[in-house]
Curated annotation (Swiss-Prot):
Protein name: Inositol oxygenase
Family named by the database record: Belongs to the myo-inositol oxygenase family.
Signal peptide per UniProt: none
Molecular function in Gene Ontology: aldo-keto reductase (NADPH) activity; ferric iron binding; inositol oxygenase activity; oxidoreductase activity, acting on NAD(P)H
CC cofactor note: Binds 2 iron ions per subunit.
Organism: Pongo abelii (Sumatran orangutan)
Catalysis: reaction(s): myo-inositol + O2 = D-glucuronate + H2O + H(+)
Enzyme Commission code: 1.13.99.1
Keyword Phosphoprotein: yes
Taxonomy, superkingdom: Eukaryota
Residues holding Fe cation 1: H98, H123, D124, D253
Record key words, sorted: Cytoplasm, Iron, Metal-binding, Oxidoreductase, Phosphoprotein
Cell compartments where the protein resides: Cytoplasm
Pfam families: MIOX
């Protein structure tokens, strides 16, 4: 069965990326008008309307039992091939190839950090949420903290939050909202999507990866933080120490997509070895 999740807005619409970084890379997010931008706006409008404290807590309760599926990491990678990116009708290759492309980009730049290579393979596996019936706005796109007022660098911030009930609630509508200053992102309730879900899967199944890996997975779509420099009032010193790692990962997530597809069959044994080392066996999803 093919499930359409549409374009991941985090990858196709980046109004906040430094133009200098974008030179010769414009084709990765060259969407500034037309029907795709309309679709991305609609995704964010739905997300910014429905992602509330109550909604996110309900999703943690719904998926926190990890009873939806039993499978290995490599089986989850293969499941990504059932997700169709409807924004690319002329590009016919499996979504799992992006996982291997990202991992191989990291492997080339950081040959001595095998755990980092594995993060590249793992980072989008939370998108299997779409196969469990979740709508696109609860799977993909930039993430942000719920329970406090959205900050300026949140995509479409000025035009998509008007119908979010939390912004009418005095507990959640200030800069700090329900949080204490510099409480740490580990105490922040993030909007629900593939980042948060995969982070929770990793914790539940006790992946033996370093803290940097957990940060990369949980916050790689948190562009208002790692690119927009917002939400500093919530950050601990630990968060700031981890920020460069998240930023380093982001370079490979955005810019490793290319028409030169990796030979997945040749790569599988290497990555299976990493899976066996850090997250072996049949996992609970």
């Amino acid at each position: 069965m093919k499930v359409t999740v549409g374009p991941d807005p985090s990858l196709v619409y980046r109004p906040d990326v430094d133009p200098e970084m974008a030179k010769d890379k414009a084709s990765f997010r060259n969407y500034t008008s037309g029907p795709l931008l309309d679709r991305v706006f609609t995704t964010y409008k739905l997300m910014h309307t429905h992602q509330t404290v109550d909604f996110v807590r309900s999703k943690h309760a719904q998926f926190g039992g990890f009873s939806y599926k039993k499978m290995t990491v490599m089986e989850a990678v293969d499941l990504l091939d059932g997700l169709v990116d409807e924004s690319d009708p002329d590009v016919d290759f499996p979504n799992s190839f992006h996982a291997f492309q990202t991992a191989e980009g990291i492997r080339k730049a950081h040959p001595d950090k095998d755990w980092f290579h594995l993060v590249g393979l793992l980072h989008d596996l939370g998108k299997v949420l779409a196969l469990f019936g979740e709508p696109q706005w609860a799977v993909v796109g930039d993430t942000f903290p719920v329970g406090c007022r959205p900050q300026a660098s949140v995509v479409f911030c000025d035009s998509t939050f008007q119908d979010n009930p939390d912004l009418q609630d005095p507990r959640y509508s200030t800069e700090l909202g329900m949080y204490q200053p510099h409480c740490g992102l580990d105490r922040v309730l993030m909007s629900w999507g593939h980042d948060e879900y995969m982070y929770q899967v990793m914790k539940f199944n006790k992946f033996s990866l370093p803290p940097e890996a957990f940060y990369m997975i949980r916050f790689h779509s948190f562009y208002p933080w790692h690119t927009g420099s917002d939400y500093q009032q919530l950050c601990s010193q630990q968060d700031l120490a981890m920020l460069p790692w998240v930023q380093e990962f982001n370079k490979f997530d955005l810019y490793t997509k290319c028409p030169d597809l990796p030979d997945v069959d040749k790569l599988r044994p290497y990555y299976q070895g990493l899976i066996d080392k850090y997250c072996p066996g049949i996992l609970s999803w």
